[in-house]
Amino acid sequence: MNILEFIQKFPDEDACRLKIKEQRDQIGVICHKCNCKEHFWLENKQCYECKHCHSRQSLRSGTVMQNSKLPFRYWFVTMHLLTSTKKSFSTEELRRQLGHKRYQPIWEMVNKIRDIMGKRDNEYQLTGQMELDDAYFSTEIPQEQKDKPLKRGRGSQSKTKVLVMAESEFVDNPKKGRKPKRVNHIKMQVISDLKSNTITSVVKEQVDKTTELVTDDSTSYTKLIEHVNSHVAKVIEPDMIPVILPWVHIAISNAKRLFLNVHHNIKTEYLQYYLNEFCYKFNRRYFGEKIFDRLLISAVSYAPDFKSKIYNRTLCG
């Protein structure tokens, strides 16, 4: 929906609160103590009460807004802005649009939303024909490494390793100028190293066993055949990358350009949240106006695990 439709649909705090309650009622409220699925709604307290053990939980409990003191409308506006464009918004721009004074609560809110985006995508595994490769994303140099000489190449302190996976299949009679493959879903996962065991564990978790996998001939991928239907490892010349692994490298290039243009000095420990947002929106690129509704469902279905490293605790914002 465009901005005018959004304002008409959610004009105030009450409209946003009612929408959250509507979504929670549709999905179902589960008691945190006895797992009972039957609840009363206490209008005067604005909370649910379990019919069995009479424990109560707030409207925000178990959602992305859990423990947050920010207005419901902040969350709605942020989710709308994040999903209304192919690109993203910096936290500073979101703070300015919301008219909030402090940066920190808005930054935490946005990363909590990115966290549940990742949780939703982790419900699914990639399948079919798939490309896989690793990439190095530029990140902020850790504080303890800033006084040390900067290494060059892949071992640089300013680079973070990411495993990139893309479902793709060859197209019959591709049109002139088009890619020989078409892409479906992608996943990106920050990894600590390129050891075979590390990559294999990620693939085992994120990829279905029936997958037909295509990679380069790196020794990091030698054990992947144990967890997929077939694995083709090719020696790929640079000029053949767009033919053999096109969508992995298109995704890498697009993500790097987005982060460079919109976000600056991303820390390694937060890179995964930015990748979550990129993959979530890429995987739903044909949803159109429905992407906001889908994100809203995820927002009431998952509580975030995001923790601020600044204070080393989950913050309420």
Regions found by a protein language model. Name each.
Residues 1-317:
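Residue-level recognition of single "structural anchor" positions
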